[in-house]
């Protein structure tokens, strides 16, 4: 082993010892999956952390891919001050793209790195409990006018049920969770 690698290991060892067995949540945009090389680079780093005993939960979004799919299918999108209004049709597309394509792409890249990962949405195992976001007062930056906006099926997280996640982590699986949640009525 050359001296620079040995020095790097000496530098990393205290951190590995400190964080081994600890759980970290890594959140990234769905944009990461657009470029396979970027995704493979990120999953290489996640695999390294996982292999030295740092427990990871990955949470991902997918707003850009959702917009692209909506455009391809002719589903109109409403964005107010940079925030998406999620109507019924958009929610159906979000389920497809978040829990489907993006989650699967991340799982495949982790498998490429030898990591056993499990794909979930926040709805699976009741992991993410959310409530529908109430209408909000939004100020239009261009006009200064204030309006009340209902963002539709956009929710706010109120609780994380870690039971399933802990079960997976205790068995050396890496959970990959799409940013979908539900309320007590399953909506």
State each model region's role.
Residues 1-187:
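Nucleotide/pyrophosphate-binding catalytic subdomain
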